[in-house]
Amino acid sequence: MANSDSAVLLNLYVQVAPADLFRLLQRQSGRIVRNGIYSARLVIWMMMNQRLQAGGTLARSVEQLVQGRFSPLLSRCKRVKEMRIGLSTGGYCQARQNLPKLLVSQTVNELIERLRQRMGKPTMEGQPRVYVLDGSSLQVEYSAELVKAYPQAQNRHGKSHRPVVRIVVLHDVDTGLAERPYWGPMYGPRAVSEQALGEQATKHVPAGSVIIGDRNFGIFSVAYHAQQQGHGTIVRLTAVRARKLVGGEISGAMDQPVQWRTSRWDGKKNRTWPADASVPGRLIAQQVGRGKHKQWLYLFTTLALPAEQIVACYGKHWRIETDLRSLKQTVRLQQLSVQSADMMEKELLVAVLAYNLVRTIMYLAAQRSGGDPRQLSFTYACNIVLDGYPTILAARGAKQQEQELNSIIDLVARCKLPKRKKRRSYPRGIWGRGFRFPIRKEEKTK
């Protein structure tokens, strides 16, 4: 990420994360607040800065600290006043490890709400938030602790090398803000499903929100728990499940009231609802697409909106695919270089917070230009925001800083994605990774 982009992000972080907030959260978590170089406020920012930089290392973050890049976040301890901040990464590394996970979690929850308020999108009655629910998987470094917590994938050829983490995130359809993620092991005896993680995620969004899910979440348990939590749902169903719901074949477009009743297969041993549980709603069947790409779309919804609006709302589901791509590639969540489960969870939370900071700048830029924040490039915006860091820090006074911030926001507003006149004529595809080295086999003990 460029320096100007970093400046804008730092300025926004300073505004939404004042030192008083961290002192309050630390006292609430029972931590003793010490006046040292690596305060919780500074450490969380340095971890975010690492996530947003292509070559983000501990050494690079400490170098930026010594050069004065993070001066607004430094406490006035003795070593800071004497300008005696060492280049060794040991102090920063220990500060990251000693950072309480509860404090990071509370900070993420608080800052997400503050960013939403900064966008001018507070929770309002009559205007429900619309979220897209989706899941993915992440890889982490091999270590005994991580392998025990998150077992590797396994097939007839043996086990994979890296532990795998399953993650589920709710993304705001309009702003692109990600809520706090939920995760668990993808394999092994304690493996958790995306649906179970999704039920945890929907518990922590305001009642009355609308949850959009693809066919993976088009099952009874997701609809039932969303109803119990006071949420509206729009979930896609498989053709088999749709036919079962209406009790017969579906020969054409339809919009029919249905009563989704639980079956003996739903939940199996993990069932947490009564045997006669049901969810009232509507089944909408429509053909979508063009020419030979036409296909049937089956949606179950508890909303009272017209069928055309329901289909259009579900059409926004694709946005989470680009959001997850930004999280895994630009914010570098695809593979986490950590050695402990505790550190993995903190890095995951901080990465989502860094992503939300960039999304906030993009939303503010779109507001100023009167455009759609979804038409801006996340990677371009991220680079511009980091490039503006020295400019804002060099500004004298709050007024000049605000002017520099506005100039960067205006620049971000120009990072528009290209408008294609027609769809690409070739099928989308990627080359497989292949095997660079022979598969390692375990020697059998005699």
Can you describe what each PLM-predicted range is?
Residues M1-R60, N98-L99, Q106-E110, E125-R129, ...:
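Single, function-defining residue in the core of a domain
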Residues S88, V132-L133:
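Noncatalytic, basic helical substrate-engagement surface that gates or grips nucleic-acid strands
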Residues S75-K101:
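Major-groove recognition helix of helix-turn-helix-like DNA-binding domains
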Residues T57-K81:
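DNA-recognition alpha helix
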Residues Q64, G91-Q94, E110:
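Generic beta-strand or strand-like secondary-structure segments
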Residues E113-K121:
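A short, well-structured juxtamembrane/interface segment
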